[in-house]
């Protein structure tokens, strides 16, 4: 069966397809609406051929990937990182037809950059629920801050944490018997905050159910690590999907965007700021976990004690706590990798220096 190489330049309204045969000759170049029916009609004309696809990662990539991954004649799917394919990014003649041609040619001649990993459907679902939860937490926080501002204006003191639950709002409302107008406002805000809390609880339950379907053991291993909470563990699992795609701990740390950038020339090496690649939410949560470790008064094991000493040593030497906590977060990412790769719960005992470095 003949193999056809298809380069696709995807956009929201219309997309450009370029089909090449094994000799590199164009069989078809066409622009169609990015519509399921039109795409399927076009691909049906190649049902007697094996088709290899190449397209850039983006908002429409997931949609197109779901359309073609279940087709019987799909031979290969290569999702290209937009910034790493220099043939397109540095081209002086950039348009949809040229881009689709370069993608198809790169696929045929095998000079495309390493493909972008496409996560499983359950990981996408967990990630969507985590994004929804984060938005709801932000909404609840705004409500609590508004209530706190009103109460302070009335001379009623209370911490932000005290208003996080039903009892905290009830105590505040009981102090407003003489302020009927403001009492009604606080009652309304309390009802909204509690409503958001209920939504968050429901979302967390859905996340836990999805995690248990696919990552039950992995989740238990992750939450055994000090500083790793339910949300952090679920985020890690939704982002990495399969730890086997990382060969070394350094690769995982790099994926989290926690390694310093490097500029080397000859014998001169300069390390700059962290790369900040990968998923921002994962990096943020690991840094938050690192802060919690740094602030613990008593460390429960030897490994945490070393991390805490490292934090204070770097803070005093460089006078930069942000760099120090980022270093702890990077070490924490290596621990996460070690736990998932070895398929064992966290262990705080360090047998030797080599083991400490491999964690």
Spans of features found by a protein language model:
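Gly/Thr-rich phosphate-binding beta-strand-loop-beta motif of the actin/hexokinase/Hsp70
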Residues: 2-21, 103
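Nucleic-acid-processing active sites and adjacent nucleic-acid-binding tracks
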Residues: 25-49
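Conserved DEDDh/DEDDy metal-dependent 3′-5′ exonuclease domain
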Residues: 41-88
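Short alpha-helix plus adjacent loop in nuclease-associated cores
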Residues: 79-115, 268-277
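A short, charged helix-loop
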Residues: 104-128, 168-180
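Glycine-rich, often acidic, oxyanion-interacting loops/wings at catalytic, nucleic-acid
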Residues: 131-221
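Phosphate-backbone recognition surface of nucleic-acid-processing proteins
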Residues: 221-224, 230, 236-317, 357
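Low-complexity, acidic/Ser/Thr- and charged residue-rich accessory regions of DNA metabolism proteins
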Residues: 267, 310-359
